[in-house]
């Protein structure tokens, strides 16, 4: 019977139920900010302090995710016990609980496993004096074992091993295969029975002549993907058809859409039959679209319908490429061929595991993975069928623990789940005692092999009433955030999180409910800040400064932070129960990962925003550390060019770049060490460079001898002493930190040798391993929580934290999906999927298991990214900012509108499955919010009714460039202004003359500085036009006929002139030449159809092609020569170096070169004569008042520089003289010989 909640209790009913319920396994689904830690602590305290049957604290097992969480929980419990003791000082029970706290089993699961090993080591013949190895030590030992294993296999000479090597290694080394063995071994350790799991995945390749693809274990994931894509194509084509029936829609194309839709429906009817799909899909043919020209067709509807059809077409093409490039029989044959290869691989991994374990036992060490697996061996044995049978040790813990409580249960893996079951009573008792707390929506550690499905399966199986199952309790009241934050989060995730993508429905139970009480505020609306990056030239023609996306976002964040602080924004202090002004420390900036952090910090600091981020990297890049590491590499092996050059250039030897170059001239082909020896042998000993080298090599010989009989740590200290380098760096800026860095390297060498490793080479390999993993020896920066600065951290680091104001940034960055592109994948359920690799032909392609895993893992990755986004949004207490960048505002809004179809709350599965960024998730969801009316010309078809409030704004990147808010810039402006006003500048003394001299100084090579060292021919042409009388705007306007633009509302959306030009060049590039047959409009039309089928041209580009102009070109004299050419080369790229004066006659600089790059449209030879042809799509007809005759001299002058440079390049390349250089303008069929 449940204990009733006291009348004066502040706990909610659901929280109270979680505190007092018992008698069965309990799962508490605790949403963000629902007070789960407080509930867990209260449950523990009540168990220890209840009047009847109190529980001693050492009879409870509490498993936390981190050591910090365990320490915090111990502290909270101790405080609560002390308060209880203060109320009743005579309580012996309270005193006993406090005395037992040092024995309390409140720890991470790894710590508990370590305790089990210390207690029952004898059950598995483990050395009681074992120690825990760090990760790097374990990896080095594993590398040694693997090297020995491969050496033995090579000696044994088994054909199966050599075939494995042939398929999974490069021509140069077998490191790829070694890495694969380690990868499978490490991955298998997340399964309770690694060997059993590896042998099980061989069933993926267990096929014969009677096997059907549909029968294989991975097929359900292929079937799901096929269904997802085909349904998406169906929806897209139905949308296109619907648009064609609207007023102004592309009605003639309805016939196309109906035909396309019928083909897709036929595929859907057979989507469960892989063989039938293989027959049907290659025959799907989207015919050429009907022409829709004229003002009666709405260009917007036309574009939307065409885009929908093109999307469907591309999806079907991708489906064909992924699954149906080979017949089902060929796919099965590939799997059958791979089975013996995979069997050999599995046996190799098992051998490695056995040898690795023996090697660790010999050294009496265990690694973190061993802790769990050894604990599992102590708690359970396997029977003949692989089932786990609990041991006496497991029964001991079942009797020992009254209850097992697990925090952050959503982040456990299968091994940990098995251990928890073995020490709890749930499997063998009607009164389960496993209490699990977590939130699957915050499961963000799949990359560490956490398994959120464990939580989800229980969530679906357990019931709120607990009858015949475990009990499920939902804590969905949020006591952290204002309603604006909760409503915004709910609005987004009701549309984004579902079973297919998200792995859980964001239903009423999952929604966040308001639990916190805040005073009213008008400024807490969630803000979406978007940067429009499309950087076109300003109207003035001046090119804008190029800034990276991170800098743009940093500037918009800085602007907002300044506004918040200057207003000032009011935040509520719950402890003081009062509102106060916002401080910098109330703000956090959350990033998905830290690569952006250094640049963002730098930009924010420039804008005057105090900011802190724990950038715990850069130790190995520190100059003083990299110099010593390079020196150690040279001591180990001087035949390493880069380390040797680094040491010679460093303060240890002090050679400059000229001396290094001089040394290389002594031996240009050998190693740099050979060059040094050669230089010293031919150079007089009194030469300054030779003296430096001689001193260094005397020390080097000494150190190499010293390293033979001494430890690495002793060698490092000897180097410090001989070079006095430790003292030297102490005198540099930041000297104390530099000395500390060098001492840390010495200390690490001592630790390395304590682990029974020896030798300089192995130590250097050990350091390389640390660098590869991103480990860092640098101490974390000391930082006070009270320091008034903006925090910057990853979303993962923010989990469990809360801040009044949160900026979630970088929402336009692509998700990291690199792992999905590997040649093989590993999955807990499906096992091992690999490309098929033919050893002789050296061809490879994805097998069906690999494709199935890729699809499965993509959905899992996207689900994880959704959960990461949920964590980010739920950190905010009072105000939330979402910050991202798009390349083009119009295209982004159009894309989001197309994705936000249907009236269901949940966005279509396929649209969410296609997401590559957080904006791909958020954009379509926000499109359906009423707030989007502020940025849309017309709102979408569906606007969802919801209490959430958003403000959405786009900022042009150009505006952020104009607002250079840098403090340094402001200071410079102030100084310049003071000088212009004749006012004294503080801090500069009587330096009037020097200031005047500097301000009046002119750079003598100004003209040369305006020319880049590398330029394209087009850039040179534009530079010439600036000085060209024919290109002065006023002159052009005089020559051109007056044309009037249509009003904007009458314009159709068409391809730009540049896009039309690109399309025309694509056609001319792919016309078969030379040709005996003439090119008329009919033949050109067939060519366009072919180019469209091959996706080289879009429908819009085909419509824009001047077919009549191309046909007319081939009837000209130059066109005829081209048809009869001996050979034709098109799109000929070149690079050549010319003196700058030869390109720009107004620049007097002698000897300065400029690298010129360009692309020649067409070069051909006819009757032994060489011709250069450049075709243009410029508008000519009707543009010049004097007609074509007036246009020719202007066009000649405009393009003469370009053609002259092309001619010079051709003559250099071929060593021949051009017969003729021709410009051809398709508009007007104008041929100009230059």
Curated annotation (Swiss-Prot):
For ATP, which residues are the binding ones?
30-37
Report the SS bond pairs: none
In the UniProt record, does the keyword Nucleus occur? no
Give GO MF terms, alphabetically. Answer: 3'-5' DNA helicase activity; 3'-5' exonuclease activity; ATP binding; ATP hydrolysis activity; double-stranded DNA binding
Instruction: Give the UniProt keywords, A-Z.
Output: ATP-binding, DNA damage, DNA repair, DNA-binding, Exonuclease, Helicase, Hydrolase, Isomerase, Nuclease, Nucleotide-binding
UvrD-like helicase ATP-binding domain location: 9-482
User: Domain UvrD-like helicase C-terminal, which positions?
Assistant: 509-800
Q: Which cofactors are reported in the record for this sequence?
A: Mg(2+)
| Superkingdom | Bacteria
Catalysed conversion reaction: Couples ATP hydrolysis with the unwinding of duplex DNA by translocating in the 3'-5' direction; ATP + H2O = ADP + phosphate + H(+)
**EC annotation from Swiss-Prot or TrEMBL:** 3.1.-.-, 5.6.2.4
Q: Which GO terms describe its biological process?
A: double-strand break repair via homologous recombination
Listed InterPro entries:
AddA, DNA_helicase_UvrD-like_C, DNA_helicase_UvrD/REP, P-loop_NTPase, PDDEXK-like_dom_sf, PDDEXK_AddAB-type, Restrct_endonuc-II-like, UvrD-like_ATP-bd
What are its GO cellular component terms?
A: cytosol; DNA helicase complex
**UniProt similarity note:** Belongs to the helicase family. AddA subfamily.
Q: Which PANTHER family match?
A: ATP-DEPENDENT HELICASE_NUCLEASE SUBUNIT A (PTHR11070:SF48), UVRD / RECB / PCRA DNA HELICASE FAMILY MEMBER (PTHR11070)
What the entry lists under NCBIfam families is as follows: addA_Gpos (TIGR02785)
* Quaternary context: Heterodimer of AddA and AddB/RexB.
Purpose of the protein: The heterodimer acts as both an ATP-dependent DNA helicase and an ATP-dependent, dual-direction single-stranded exonuclease. Recognizes the chi site generating a DNA molecule suitable for the initiation of homologous recombination. The AddA nuclease domain is required for chi fragment generation; this subunit has the helicase and 3' -> 5' nuclease activities.
Put simply, this protein is called ATP-dependent helicase/nuclease subunit A
